[in-house]
Regions:
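TRNA-recognition modules of translation machinery and tRNA-sensing kinases, especially anticodon-binding
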Residues: 1-262
Length: 262
């Protein structure tokens, strides 16, 4: 978050940097670096044109806070993602699956994020709909049907290539990417292959489509690895799906702090 000293407008500093420079993933950078980029590139407030050089860049909580109940109400937050509903119900869902792994749960529903500067038509809203699949596996026992998508060709943009001065896309097959460790989890590789086939069937232009790996600085705290399916629209790369290997982060935290056994 950066605020204009003249008109008081608030802006997402990373978005200002991305719009004014060749930096694609400013969200992954520390606030100090974003502030330096704002100063070095003479970025001004979009609302009034006042230079923003020297203004502090601060973290901002994207969760909507609210009060639950009357009187001395308990604090609560609107969910920023739909996934936690699945994790909270994991003990019951496992019973429904007769205790057998792997099993998957799909859902669709609303999520809420207190965006600093909503923009991009329907691409960045404060209330939006998410659809997702959470697949629960035993990483030591369960293997995906990788052979079904082993020969599917994908265009990858790994973190190593993003950080290299002359980095470029890696066009390869799902099988080769998993075998060579470009994609760390065979389960992630499997779902990237399934998604690639689906996007091709529905008519996505594969010349303007890629899977981009999250940089370490932008990867969510719960994710051991994460890739985004992105499509180029009017010169901007737009995330249309995320593929995260969450490990046992969510279930272990609910087990640690909740009353049920996870």
């Amino acid at each position: 978050l950066v605020e204009c000293p003249e008109c008081g407008a608030s802006h997402r500093a990373d978005h200002l940097v991305e719009d004014a420079t060749d930096v694609e993933d400013a969200e992954a950078l520390p606030g100090e670096e974003v502030a330096e980029l704002i100063a070095d590139n003479d970025i001004a407030c979009p609302a009034c044109g006042t230079p923003l050089a020297g203004e502090p860049v601060e973290a901002f909580n994207l969760m909507f806070a609210t009060d639950i109940g009357p009187g001395d109400a308990q604090p609560g937050y609107l969910r920023p993602e739909t996934a936690q509903g699945i994790f909270v119900e994991f003990p019951r869902l496992k019973e429904y699956a007769r205790g057998n792994l792997p099993f998957g749960i799909t859902q669709i529903g609303p999520a809420y994020r207190n965006e600093i500067s909503p923009r991009g038509g329907l691409l960045r809203l404060r209330e939006f709909t998410q659809a997702e699949l959470e697949q629960f596996i035993d990483p030591e026992e369960d293997e995906p049907p990788l052979d079904r998508v082993r020969d599917v060709e994908v265009r990858l943009y790994p973190a190593t290539e993003q950080e290299a001065d002359d980095g470029d896309y890696l066009t390869t097959t799902v099988g080769e990417a998993v075998d060579e460790g470009v994609i760390g989890s065979p389960w992630v590789g499997y779902y990237l292959g399934v998604a690639q086939e689906w996007y091709e069937r529905v008519g996505v232009d594969t010349d303007r489509f890629r899977f981009r790996q999250h940089l370490a600085g932008e990867r969510a705290h719960y994710a051991a690895d994460c890739w985004d399916a992105e499509s180029e629209v009017d010169g901007d790369w737009i995330e249309i799906a995320g593929f995260a290997y969450r490990g046992d982060y969510d279930l272990s935290k609910h087990d640690e702090y909740g009353d049920d056994a996870f």
